[in-house]
């Protein structure tokens, strides 16, 4: 069982859900050009929250965490309940490993909006990074309860359960992921991974054969077959 693989998957899920800035992919130079243009606009409209949010978003794209945090602080001085600023400041704090500050921002969001899925996922991820996996699992249980139709909560919870070797629960959650997105090969492989960890190799082999029959790349399956020898 590759714990690092599951930790990376958790991070991937959270990042995809968190950093939904809605901006097009650009090169670093293009982002820098955009940043210069935004700075010029801010000079003309220094109190525009929208412009400061856009500038901070570009800072995030360039991984300029401190600059982004400064922008969000500026916004929050005038509007302490700006959820967007709190949300992405927490994201930046997480990248800087300032977990207590990230936790505080996510909690402030949840006080205002208890059903904010991305904030709760972000908080759960911070708890995992802090080594508080049981607390993280409690949060993910709430995410799934509040958003039963969203695959993201199930993926995050299943990944953590797998990492914690809570295989019965993980197997159920991977099944739920597959129900919601049956064409996602990664979910099927994660399900098979848990079956192998549980010693259910024949069931795992049947599932692998199904994937092979669907044309899934053999390179992705080879390691799983080898684990069952």
Feature annotation, model-predicted:
Residues 12-20:
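Bacterial N-terminal signal peptides
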Residues 44, 78, 112, 146, ...:
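Structural marker of alpha-solenoid helical repeat scaffolds
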């Amino acid at each position: 069982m590759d714990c690092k693989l599951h930790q990376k998957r958790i991070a991937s899920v959270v990042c995809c859900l968190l950093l939904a800035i809605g901006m097009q992919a650009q090169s670093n130079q293009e982002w820098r050009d955009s940043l210069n243009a935004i700075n010029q606009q801010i000079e003309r409209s220094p109190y525009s929250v929208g412009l400061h949010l856009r500038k901070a978003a570009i800072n995030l794209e360039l991984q300029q965490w401190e600059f982004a945090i400064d922008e969000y602080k500026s916004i929050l001085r005038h509007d302490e309940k700006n959820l967007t600023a709190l949300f992405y400041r927490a994201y930046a704090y997480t990248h800087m490993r300032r977990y207590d500050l990230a936790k505080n921002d996510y909690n402030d969001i949840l006080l205002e909006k208890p059903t904010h899925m991305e904030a709760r996922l972000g908080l759960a991820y911070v708890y995992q990074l802090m080594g508080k996996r049981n607390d993280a699992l409690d949060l993910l249980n709430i995410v799934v309860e509040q958003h039963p139709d969203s695959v993201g909560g199930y993926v995050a919870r299943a990944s953590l359960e797998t990492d914690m070797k809570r295989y019965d629960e993980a197997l159920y959650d991977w099944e739920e992921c597959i129900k919601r997105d049956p064409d996602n090969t990664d979910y099927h492989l994660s399900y098979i991974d848990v079956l192998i960890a549980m010693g259910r190799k024949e069931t795992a082999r049947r599932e692998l054969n199904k994937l092979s029959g669907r044309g899934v790349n053999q390179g992705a399956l080879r390691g799983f077959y080898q684990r069952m020898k």
